[in-house]
Structure formats: structure tokens, C-alpha cells
């Protein structure tokens, strides 16, 4: 048998190592556990016992990722039990879609191999798909990617009529964008966050951190979310840039991030677009893609001066 040259060289020149990205750790068992608990809760007439069922059958035996998701989004057993009863049409419509988690993450190992080539310092992170109560399709805690399956795997068939406003309108737009078809990009966006430093502070700091994750996830997957912000942005770029410059140093995020369409733009999450364009324009000027991606990921997002310097280096904002 003829050995590949690099393996033959390793045998001759021991010790020799070949650096590759580790296979991703993906946990999906919480989804099946949720639905068995859901069925039990619907059959239980006593309110206190319904909460106990959620605690005993979903929360306590749940994965570390589920527990992290509940911590980050402040989910409680009582909230789960209440939502299970309150939204039967929603749960019936989303149930079959949550079975797509394995298929939706089928490209993950390949995508992370590309990520590792672009960013050799990539650190491993686990990914957990669990069912939440509609407060995130994806978030992180340390080295854990936490996917809210009831959101991330959805599509236009999801029934939101029972949900309260403004959640109903926001999620109608979100599900109509077919997030389940974009799951590879969503996983990568959150994986980028596990490599970045956290931030608190100004709009600029949050928007750039989100935009870098969007840019890198698109670079790897070739996709970005089919959300209105990406259609709206190019048509209103001058307005977005002017308002961003005026508001970027403040800590008010309501017009820009984690919001609904009730804002001056009439489109949610325009801050993602602003941050994405900053990252995109920065990368256009860089001769060394690997080095530039490392600088973006390793930027100190908690330092407003460092973030301001990055924004200025991008050239995206108009001159005063």
C-alpha cells in the first residue's frame, strides 16, 4: 500500500503532528425529551403537577446545554408548562420541524473545517439543540452554542396566531424567512460568538460584534438570513450610516438590535446590517484574509476605543 507523502514524512521524522479541526459535539436529545414531556403535560389537569412534570421529565434529566439555555434566557419550568397549554396551534405546527435538527446540521463538520482553515486558532465548542420558549433561536454561554429549536428550525408553516403582540408580528417575519433552511449559517454565527470576547457598552460595540459573526458565517456557509434587514439595508444605506454615526456611542439599542419593526427604520435588527457592512468593508481592504479574520475575531469588543478604531479602519462611515 502506498502511503500519502505527508504520512510517510511523519513516519520518518517523528514526532509529527497534523492539525485539524476537532469533530463538533452536537447534542439533540433534549428535543425528544421536550415532546414526551409536552404530551404528559397536556394530559395532566392539575397546574402544579404540570410544572412538576416539566421539572422532572425535561429540566432535571436535560443536557448541560439545556441548563445553560435556561440560565441565559431565564426560562423556568412554570413558564414552559404555561406555554405548552397556551399555544397548542403553535406547538403542533413546530413539532415536526424540530425533527430536522440532524439534517439541518449535516454540514457542520465540513463548515468547521473551513472555519479552522480560515482561523487556525479556532477553539472547540459544543452545540445543543433544545426547545425553549421563544426568546432565542441561538445564543452562547462560554464554549457552548445553544440553539432554540422551536425558532431556529422553523419555516413559514409555523402558526403564530396564538402568540401575543409584538411577538406575533416579529415571529411571523422571522418564520417567513425560513430559518430552518439557514441553520448552517445560524450555527456558524453562534460558533463565531464562542470565539469572540463578550461586550457591554455602546451600540457600536454590540453591532460590530454581531456584524463580524454575520460576515464570517456568510463567508463559510455562502448564506445569510433571508430577513428584511438585508433587503432594506442596501436601499437605505445613507440613512443607516448617518443615524448609526449619531447613535453609535450611546448605549440605547432599541432602534437597532434585538427589537421588532416598531422603530424608525420599520425593520427589525438593522444593527446587524450596520455591523455586517463594517466587517465587509474592513475585509475588502485586507490583503491577508486569515490575518484579518483573526483581528476581527480577537478584537476587544469590551473596549470602545478599539471598536471605534476598527470602524474607522473599515471606511464605512461617512466623514463628518
Locate each region found by the language model.
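Positively charged n-region of N-terminal signal peptides that target proteins for export
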Residues: 1-4
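Post-HExxH zinc-binding segment in Zn-dependent metallohydrolases
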Residues: 24-39, 200-245
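Bacterial N-terminal signal peptides
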Residues: 6-16
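Acidic helix-start/capping segments at beta-turn-to-alpha-helix junctions
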Residues: 55-62, 126-140, 233, 299-302
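Pan-zinc metallopeptidase signature
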Residues: 58, 245-320
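N-terminal mature-domain "stem" immediately C-terminal to a signal peptide or N-terminal signal-anchor/transmembrane
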Residues: 22-81
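Surface-exposed patches in mature extracellular/periplasmic domains of secreted proteins
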Residues: 50-54, 122-131, 201-205, 224-231, ...
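Acidic/His-rich structured neighborhood in mature extracellular/periplasmic domains
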Residues: 82-222
